[in-house]
């Protein structure tokens, strides 16, 4: 279960970083904005790994011997992307007009990694529904907190959250490889 908690923490970093940005750049009430961010990001971060898990489970029969390598490879790719994004100079997005459509798009964008990571749940000895719920709850908590942190600290912490999440995913990928060998 510790693997799922670490996975949840790592996957929540995208939503956490975006929530920090939302808090820093948006004039809305932090409580209302925090609740919206928690709801959107938490729900999508819970659903996407479940979809990835179900897709991976369907392929597991003919991929059984390669499953740990595929899962580790996907996690390593996600980790590399997150680490790269933590150093990349991003384009400032105008999120001052935060509509439901914008929140929906942000929730989808931040949960694509969770879709791929859901495949890793097929090779971990965990209950998928509990794992996905835990990922969603942890993401919701981090998203809510991120809005308040963004109000206080501004955008400085955004890239640090991405880097930490990427490093944790890389460690999980290495553990999966070590167990498979």
Curated annotation (Swiss-Prot):
The keyword Ion transport applies. GO terms for molecular function: manganese ion transmembrane transporter activity. Keywords: Cell inner membrane, Cell membrane, Ion transport, Manganese, Membrane, Transmembrane, Transmembrane helix, Transport. The chain crosses the membrane at residues 4-24, 31-51, 59-79, 102-122, 129-149, 161-181. Signal peptide: none annotated. Probably functions as a manganese efflux pump. This is Putative manganese efflux pump MntP. The gene is mntP.
